[in-house]
Amino acid sequence: MTTVGVSLFRRSPEKITMKIATFLGLSFLLIASYVLICEAQHPGFQELLILEENMRDPENSKERSCAKPRENCNRMNILCCRGECVCPTFGDCFRYGD
């Protein structure tokens, strides 16, 4: 019984290094797959961040076009005007009062 327990702790450094490298490699692949899956489910995430940043910028609001009522923001790539239109995270753009 003691020889089995002792042999488990007498692993060569090469085997330990290989196990650690394998674990790190698989962890990296798992994280990369999560990132790719998230990007596939939310393809406009980067555009959304740019949209939110532009909507908070009052100096450049005249350079952006207002979306038509119920026009889909992500499909049309239209940045809403500050104060007149709202582009929610998901769904359609809408104007105040529509």
Swiss-Prot record:
Location(s) in or outside the cell: Secreted
Superkingdom to which the source organism belongs: Eukaryota
Molecular-function GO terms, alphabetical: ion channel regulator activity; toxin activity
Transmembrane segments: none
Expression across tissues: Expressed by the venom gland.
Keyword Disulfide bond annotated: yes
Disulfide bonds: 66-81, 73-85
One GO CC term on file: extracellular region
Keywords for this protein: Disulfide bond, Ion channel impairing toxin, Knottin, Secreted, Signal, Toxin
Residue span(s) of the pro-peptide: 41-64
Domain remark in the UniProt entry: The presence of a 'disulfide through disulfide knot' structurally defines this protein as a knottin.
Family: Belongs to the hainantoxin family. 17 subfamily.
Function: Putative ion channel inhibitor.
Name of the protein this chain belongs to: Hainantoxin-XVII-2
Gene source species: Cyriopagopus hainanus
